[in-house]
């Protein structure tokens, strides 16, 4: 739109500067009016010159066609502004068109005399140029004949024989009076956007307008008809050979300076984002019927036409969907109707409930490239339509359609989608915006909507009323090709898939008054018109991919065509995929491709809000199973996308279930498909028949998630189709398909019952690398918070899915690696949950129970065993309903082993020294006892824990296990446990029944949450039990607090062994507690029978009470030995702990964040901290227990009545949740304040949007936002700041997603070694922590390999619900929960450790929190 070189350089090649350099497509007035008019409220039709249609005609004439076209292209004339305030549509009068680039008419918009011009030539002036007047002998060439007087200055020029003007002052040659006038006016008043030059330029002292009007009158008189441009044109054409002006397309860098006069009709080359190493800021999909209507409209006349694009904008997926086109039926003959036409369009858009998302116009006979004027006008529209805020931002695009460009090798129109990148903020007055070629996908409609038919009919009726305005479709277009045949070739690819092509085509022929076809013969090949040989070549390419259609239409019968095309497409797709992958890799190295998370967090055109709005819970489509996806770079959907799906639904429309794997159109699918790629991504400008580019991954500016970056981080939550990788907590809560991060099959997950989905989700989450998880879970979200949140809203959506997620996330942090290795995976409660979910399929009792029974202590046994055993366990888990005898034998075996260990000092020392043992100890809190059992030497039989051994059927295994465990634990205090078990068994049975009703998947899912809970409880109970029975445990727990890691480890080991024994003995009790937990957990489940009771009582009600009793009894049994504590006391402790946590949270969060950064470290740290440490109080609760288990473990530790502790826990949990909610609410408020959504109009926002910002400014902003949001761990120590920081990433989300906080309990630093896994760079804090004596002797750092996970401290529920951990844990373990480090964004998690590490002493602080 800006001065496009429509005119091109002077034929002579003289240095003619086309003056329309800044043509905004409007005269000064126009542009301004337009801006004002376009108001966001109604879809304001972009101010597009309606007469643009007229311009096309000029183009046809050739002399100024190029220029004219340019003018028309974008310029909205300052035509009558929409009278309706509602119609923000700036009305572009035909004057714009008049101003065809060449045509002085365009300039008519002249500042002062625009109206006069209109009156004079009534729109016909559009075709009048100096050449025209000279040909009619109205003007004669001569020296010094042309003058301009402006603000007291006079400029003189020569009228050359070719109709150009040579300036005396600058010796520059101007193609049109307008160009010269603008140039001269700009010299005097640079800020003035001068309009048409015809009213300013004088010939022999008389304004050119007067000459033009005189000429037009004479023509009209001769015709004895009202001035009719078409007629004038026709007459002139017959008299004068058509002057074909060859348009030259200039690179944008050739017109970099606005201060040099450029022809506004100069064509500027638009380049794809890939050419500049960037990602397209948003995806574009166009409905085939909308494209068909626009293309048809442009074919009706050889003059420029224009229209508006209506559609929708999905912030979540950054997808602009163009669903309807609204032709502007206005020509130079009825300019006065322009405003009315636009208001009608506006009303139609409102009625259709569509947004104005752009405009289209035609370049009838020249290239589909924007003119400078088009560029300016388009940029204007983009600015006007960006909305008041990021939330209201809507992109605006321009389609340029070239129907009759004679150098087009095919018969299909060239359709290009243009979007302007604004110049740098500080150079806006100096530079033109840069036109970028946007890739778009064409979504085939099943049928042609009725309104499209009516629009086609109206367009034909409108243009046919003006003589010589409409193309005669029976005539020959080129060689032997008629206009009708050309139209058929271009429209056919856009025909609806389900409708009869013949019927539709014959209807169009009837409308155009052409011969109808008896047998519809689809254009089988793309006809290539060879201009040189004038022969029509036929390409064999069956698929016609025209830029313009972007549709993948295969000419042969559609079905066959598709199948035929598919093979080729697949091959080409594969190649393209490989190439694109190679390119991507190359670019990654060259450009340092940021991860989606990072990109999302960056301000970019994509995400007009630099602030993360939503943090994906899972990577868009973590199709890759690798546990660790180091960078969340826009994941390419591996296979799913590549399936060639017929162009079906754009990614946007893809059913949510499929979201992860966006269905790509056959073509694109063949290509590398990104989750955000739309079905058919065709390069908008692909002129060649079958040429298509690999779609640019439209990530919001990168990654602004493809899921633009932080993948999906900042998409809006309300998008119709959840963006592939984005999961909102709410989604998770309701297990919406989009949410389920089932890594293996998003689609499947979507279809799976929420519960089932969740389970895999946990697994997937765990499997996913921390990075992946990080991408998925906003680190800001603490699991405790999640849990609290859920508890608060348990009624709304069971905490299960969220808890599961939280737990999974937390655990994943720890178990991701473990997940990788089955053994480690099993250890994690989350993993356990996942396993449980899977084991469900095997009818395996809740692994939770298993985990509980086996509780990390069992891990102490041979870790090597655990692996094989684990695998077997999983299998055995399926057969978890083994006879109780089996479990008993296991117990016996376990006890024997424990005895041996006890009695054999060598073995003991060995065990104590073994890293596995340390890890096992750390993991003792893990829910999955199977792994634990395996490590204990139980073998892989889950049944033992599940209670298969207990003699309980798998379903009842837990219950049974409880009972049998109780029996075995009778030795340790089985009577209460047994009683509880009995009570529980009923509940448990109920739960089981419920689970059956719910279906194992949902049950498992719940169990997952439960797992978190269970793990939490189990940890506490196990710890309590372990620590309580043997004094050494107490000592050990105390020692764990103690600095000497060895002693602690030994104590812990002893503890562990004792615990194991106790567990074995109490396995019953623990089993009971496991059952309890499960039941209890179930209580949490929204679906759970007990849930109601639970929600009603924040304490466990009914079954809960029993459960709590059981649990407490179990705890009491195990940990009852420790001094007794009252519920109140525990509560107080808990609250204290909570407060401490909250206060310390900052550090904690920082540490955790750091840990999180090191993907694996988080879990390990948590586990570390959670390592069973003898409570200082003497209660042995793992550090984890301290936090999470603090209530349960504490109760055990403090010797509180276990029942009370349990029920307390529930109550505490709920209360905590509530508190947390409060905090969160406040936090969110804070967040908003701190990281509010930027004002869209603010420079920073614009910069973020890549609009109007200097690169440096943009860069700075990006850096700031990145550092604030992503890279740097919060520096402030205050919890609020920590929270704020984490919140910065995404205000609401952050809290919604569980954060993997490495809230490891007190001093357990032993696990830290594992944290320092070789793979990851650990932050100073991590190192500091690892350096601290650990509770466990684990000498071997986990390398981050999943295998090492078994050594890794199990993520402790405390970590998961660290905030929930009753303060008692603090007291009990003598450790204070570490502060949780919260990251502003997922990116933080995945990001390399911050340059500045928190002081090492921070780690110490954390470790020593217990002493605070």
From Swiss-Prot:
InterPro entries: JAMM/MPN+_dom, JAMM_MPN+_peptidase_M67A, MPN, RAMA. The modification Phosphothreonine is found at residue 1297. GO terms for biological process: proteolysis. Residues 284-420 form the MPN domain. Residues 572-600 form a coiled coil. One of its GO terms (molecular function) is metal-dependent deubiquitinase activity. It comes from the Eukaryota. Residues 23-35, 103-114 have a biased composition (Acidic residues). CDD domains: MPN_2A_DUB. Keywords: Coiled coil, Hydrolase, Metal-binding, Metalloprotease, Phosphoprotein, Protease, Zinc. SUPFAM superfamilies: JAB1/MPN domain (SSF102712). The JAMM motif may mediate the protease activity. This is MPN domain-containing protein CG4751. It comes from Drosophila melanogaster.
């Amino acid at each position: 739109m800006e001065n496009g070189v429509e005119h091109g350089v002077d034929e002579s090649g003289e240095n003619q500067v086309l003056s329309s350099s800044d043509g905004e497509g409007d005269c000064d007035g126009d542009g301004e009016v337009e801006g004002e008019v376009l108001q966001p409220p109604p879809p304001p039709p972009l101010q597009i010159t309606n007469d643009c249609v007229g311009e096309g005609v000029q183009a046809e004439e050739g002399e100024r066609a190029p220029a004219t076209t340019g003018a028309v292209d974008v310029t909205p004339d300052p035509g009558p502004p929409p009278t309706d305030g509602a119609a923000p549509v700036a009305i572009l009068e035909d004057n714009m068109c008049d101003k065809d680039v060449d045509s002085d008419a365009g300039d008519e918009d002249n500042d002062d005399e625009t109206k006069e011009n209109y009156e004079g030539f009534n729109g016909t002036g559009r075709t009048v140029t100096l050449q025209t007047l000279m040909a009619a002998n109205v003007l004669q060439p001569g020296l010094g004949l042309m003058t301009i007087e402006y603000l007291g200055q006079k400029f003189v020029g020569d009228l050359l024989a070719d109709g150009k003007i040579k300036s005396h002052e600058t010796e520059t040659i101007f193609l049109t009076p307008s160009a010269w006038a603008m140039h001269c006016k700009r010299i005097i008043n640079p800020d003035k956007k001068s309009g048409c030059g015809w009213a300013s330029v004088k010939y022999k002292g008389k304004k050119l307008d007067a000459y033009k009007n005189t000429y037009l009158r004479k023509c009209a008189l001769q015709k004895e008809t009202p001035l009719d441009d078409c007629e004038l044109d026709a007459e002139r054409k017959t008299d004068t050979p058509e002057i074909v002006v060859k348009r030259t397309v200039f690179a944008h860098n050739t017109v970099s300076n606005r201060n040099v006069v450029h022809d506004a009709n100069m064509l500027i080359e638009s380049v794809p984002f890939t050419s500049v190493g960037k990602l397209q800021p948003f995806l574009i999909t166009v409905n085939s019927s909308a494209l068909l209507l626009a293309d048809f409209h442009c074919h009706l006349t050889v003059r420029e036409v224009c229209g508006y694009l209506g559609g929708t904008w999905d912030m979540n997926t950054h997808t602009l969907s163009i669903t309807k086109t609204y032709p502007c039926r206005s020509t130079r003959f009825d300019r006065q109707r322009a405003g009315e036409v636009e208001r009608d369009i506006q009303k139609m858009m409102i009625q259709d409930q569509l947004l104005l998302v752009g405009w289209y116009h035609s370049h009838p006979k020249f290239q589909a490239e924007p003119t400078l004027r088009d560029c300016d006008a388009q940029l204007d529209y983009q600015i006007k339509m960006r909305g008041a805020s990021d939330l209201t931002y809507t992109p605006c695009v321009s389609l340029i359609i070239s129907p009759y460009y004679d150098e087009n090798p095919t018969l299909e129109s060239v359709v290009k989608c243009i979007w302007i990148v604004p110049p740098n903020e500080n150079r806006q007055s100096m530079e033109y915006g840069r036109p970028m070629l946007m890739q778009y996908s064409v979504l085939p409609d099943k049928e042609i909507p009725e309104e499209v038919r009516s629009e086609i009919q109206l367009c034909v009726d409108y243009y046919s009323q003006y003589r010589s305005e409409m193309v005669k479709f029976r005539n020959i277009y080129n060689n032997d090709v008629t206009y009708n045949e050309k139209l058929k070739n271009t429209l056919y690819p856009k025909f609806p898939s389900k409708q009869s092509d013949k019927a539709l085509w014959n209807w169009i022929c009837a409308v155009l008054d052409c011969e109808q076809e008896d047998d519809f013969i689809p254009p089988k090949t793309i006809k290539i018109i060879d201009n040189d040989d004038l022969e029509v070549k036929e390409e064999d390419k069956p698929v016609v991919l025209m830029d313009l259609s972007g549709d993948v239409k295969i000419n042969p019968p559609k079905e066959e065509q598709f199948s035929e095309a598919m093979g080729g497409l697949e091959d080409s797709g594969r190649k393209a995929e490989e190439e694109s992958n190679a390119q991507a890799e190359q670019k990654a190295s060259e450009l340092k491709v940021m991860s989606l998370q990072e990109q999302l967090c960056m301000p970019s055109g994509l995400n007009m809000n630099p602030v993360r709005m939503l943090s994906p819970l899972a990577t868009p489509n973590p199709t890759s199973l690798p546990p660790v996806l180091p960078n969340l770079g826009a994941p390419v959907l591996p296979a799913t996308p590549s399936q060639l799906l017929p162009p079906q639904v754009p990614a946007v429309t893809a059913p949510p279930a499929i979201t992860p794997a966006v269905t790509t159109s056959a073509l694109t699918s063949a290509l590398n498909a990104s989750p955000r790629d739309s079905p058919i991504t065709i390069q908008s400008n692909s002129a060649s028949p079958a040429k298509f580019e690999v779609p640019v991954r439209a990530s919001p500016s990168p990654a602004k998630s493809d899921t633009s970056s932080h993948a999906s981080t900042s998409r809006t939550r309300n998008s119709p189709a959840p963006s592939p990788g984005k999961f909102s907590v709410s989604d998770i809560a309701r297990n919406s398909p989009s949410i389920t991060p089932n890594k293996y099959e998003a689609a499947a997950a979507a279809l799976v019952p929420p519960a089932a989905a969740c389970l895999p989700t946990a697994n997937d989450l765990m499997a996913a690398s921390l990075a992946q998880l990080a991408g998925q879970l906003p680190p800001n979200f603490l699991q405790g918070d999640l849990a609290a949140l859920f508890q608060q809203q348990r009624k709304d959506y069971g905490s299960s899915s969220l808890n599961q997620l939280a737990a999974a996330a937390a655990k994943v942090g720890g178990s991701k690696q473990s997940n990788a290795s089955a053994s480690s995976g099993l250890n994690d409660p989350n993993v356990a949950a996942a396993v449980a979910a899977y084991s469900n399929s095997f009818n395996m009792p809740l692994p939770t129970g298993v985990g509980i029974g086996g509780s990390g202590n069992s891990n102490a046994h041979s870790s090597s065993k655990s692996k094989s055993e684990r695998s077997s366990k999983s299998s055995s888990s399926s057969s978890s309903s083994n006879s109780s005898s089996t479990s008993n034998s296991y117990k016996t075996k376990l006890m024997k082993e424990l005895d041996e260990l006890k009695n054999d000092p060598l073995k003991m020392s060995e065990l104590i020294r073994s890293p596995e043992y340390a890890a096992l100890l750390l993991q003792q809190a893990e829910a999955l006892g199977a792994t634990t059992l395996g490590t204990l030497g139980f073998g892989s039989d889950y049944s033992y824990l599940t209670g298969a051994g207990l003699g309980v059927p798998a379903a009842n295994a837990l219950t049974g296990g409880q009972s049998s465990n109780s029996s075995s634990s009778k030795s340790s205090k089985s009577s209460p446990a047994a009683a509880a078990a009995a009570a529980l068994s009923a509940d448990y049975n109920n739960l089981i029944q419920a689970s059956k009703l719910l279906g194992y998947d949902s049950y498992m899912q719940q169990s997952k949450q439960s797992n978190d809970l269970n793990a939490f409880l189990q940890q506490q109970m196990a710890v309590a039990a372990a620590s309580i029975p043997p004094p050494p445990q107490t000592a050990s727990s105390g020692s764990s607090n103690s600095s000497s890691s060895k002693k602690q480890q030994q104590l812990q080991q002893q503890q562990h062994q004792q615990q194991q024994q106790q567990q074995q003995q109490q396995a019953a009790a623990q089993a009971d507690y496991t059952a309890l937990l499960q039941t209890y957990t179930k209580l949490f489940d929204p679906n759970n029978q007990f849930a109601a009771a639970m929600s009603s009582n924040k304490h466990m009600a009914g079954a809960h009470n029993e459960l709590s009793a059981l649990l407490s009894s179990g705890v009491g049994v195990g940990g009852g030995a420790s001094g007794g504590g009252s519920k109140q006391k525990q509560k107080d402790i808990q609250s204290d702990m909570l407060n401490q946590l909250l206060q310390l949270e900052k550090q904690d969060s920082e540490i955790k964040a750091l840990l999180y950064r090191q993907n694996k470290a988080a879990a390990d740290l948590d586990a570390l901290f959670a390592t069973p440490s003898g409570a200082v109080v003497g209660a042995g609760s793992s550090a984890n227990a301290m936090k999470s288990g603090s209530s349960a473990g504490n109760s055990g530790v403090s010797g509180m009545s276990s029942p009370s502790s349990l029920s307390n826990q529930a109550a505490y949990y709920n209360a905590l949740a509530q508190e947390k909610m409060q905090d969160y609410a406040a936090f969110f408020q804070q967040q908003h304040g701190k990281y509010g959504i930027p004002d869209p109009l603010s420079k920073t926002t614009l910069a973020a949007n890549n609009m109007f910002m200097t690169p440096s400014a943009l860069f700075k902003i990006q850096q700031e936002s990145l550092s604030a949001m992503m890279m740097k761990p919060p520096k402030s120590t205050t919890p609020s700041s920590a929270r704020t920081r984490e919140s910065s990433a995404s205000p609401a989300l952050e809290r919604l997603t569980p954060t993997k906080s490495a809230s490891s309990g007190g001093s357990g630093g032993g696990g830290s070694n594992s944290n320092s896994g070789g793979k990851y760079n650990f932050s100073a804090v991590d190192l500091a922590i690892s350096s601290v004596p650990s509770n466990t002797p684990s000498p071997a750092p986990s390398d981050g390999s999943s295998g090492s996970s078994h050594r890794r401290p199990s993520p402790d529920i405390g970590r998961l619900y660290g905030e929930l951990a009753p303060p008692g844990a603090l007291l009990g373990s003598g450790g204070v929960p570490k502060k949780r480090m919260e990251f502003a964004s997922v990116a933080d998690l995945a990001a390399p450790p911050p340059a500045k590490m928190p002081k090492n002493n921070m780690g110490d602080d954390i470790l020593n929190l217990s002493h605070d």
